[in-house]
Amino acid sequence: MTQLSMHSPVGDLTLSQDDGAIVAIDWGWAPMQSATGLLTEAKAQLDAYFDGALTVFDLPLRPAGTAFQRAVYDVMTSIPYGKTMTYAEVAQKVGSVARAVGGVCGSNPIPIVIPCHRVVAAPGRTPGHRVAGTLGGYSGHGGVDTKRALLRLEGADGPGRQLDLNLSMS
């Protein structure tokens, strides 16, 4: 496995690849790095995403996980840039429940590229004891503030959208 770290508006990221596919994006900086063509391309695509110039990633991905987790990852990658889907909507697509989908989102090994930040709680719900409102949680660096920043970057709270990114998450 090889890794490449990069700075981003939501914190330092370390990209990992193995056998020609991206297998992880972790928060933080890796002490040992080795740039490969794939990692350089992944960094370029992430830079373009953060600059607002890329809305669809085109990278080979191989996230670890069960068949259920991979099914949830597939649904998440189908959510268009700037759009959101509720945990319950994702659950319906994979024949499960919202809480299980939330668990998969929380263990997503390739955040941003597999856009778990686009999965939100249903309006008017209070999911779990840690979060309230319509955003749901976010286990990545910076928590819900990072989720909010990614959704704002994508314009998910723009005119005609029903997502309120100004919610208090306490």
List the predicted regions and their residue ranges.
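Major-groove DNA-recognition helix of helix-turn-helix-type DNA-binding domains
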Residues: N108-I114
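Basic nucleic-acid-binding alpha-helical/helix-turn surface characteristic of O6-alkylguanine DNA
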Residues: M1-S96, D145-S170
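Short active-site segment of divalent metal-dependent hydrolases/proteases
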Residues: V120
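Hydrophobic alpha-helical packing residues
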Residues: C116-H117, L150
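DNA major-groove recognition helix of helix-turn-helix
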Residues: C105
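Short, amphipathic alpha-helical segments
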Residues: G95, I110, G140-V144
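DPxDG-like acidic metal-binding loop motif
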Residues: P123-L135, S139-D145, L151
